[in-house]
């Protein structure tokens, strides 16, 4: 069996360094795909192809991400679709949830949980990435950390969403390790749909997501 050390034999130092960078980027791209950071994964793969345009593993991974993104874009989210039993407001398998948090382990864990319950999931790890991801995919629900370590905070994302045309009724849930009284009052005043404390209980997250989607869909039906 030919191992990685055998593959590196005969490479010049520059070629070996380039190979190491490619493997490093591929590792990040795989991780991003697993946690639902598809836009970040595609950007990292661009770096892979800049170093190795014919990289087969990169091509396979890009194909997988492209297929997933296409599937997300094809979901049906508009209109009042009535199920066979006449219940219109229940969540659908096509419902997309966006999670925003700087903890990549949490992103991977929650993405897996949502998928197991039949939802689609996308993620972002910063305010700017969240804006780009939301604009690209238009999720049905947003779950965001309250306090990012750097940059704009979760409330900034919430206010951006609620002041963007057509997005005012998108449910928004906050994640928090701890929260002060002023932030809690502000969240209630501004109309945040729910606050979920960390460490996250998967059942609580799923129940909150289902409840928010059902409430939103019921109001759309009444309208």
Predicted regions, residues:
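The C-terminal output helix
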Residues: 71-73, 210-223
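Alpha4 helix (beta4-alpha4-beta5 surface) of REC/receiver domains from two-component response regulators
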Residues: 155-156, 179-197, 204-207
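Conserved acidic segment of CheY-like receiver
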Residues: 93-105, 110-114, 141-142, 205
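Active-site beta3 strand of CheY-like receiver
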Residues: 137-148
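Short hydrophobic/Thr-rich beta-strand motif most characteristic of the beta2 strand and flanking loop
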Residues: 118-126, 133
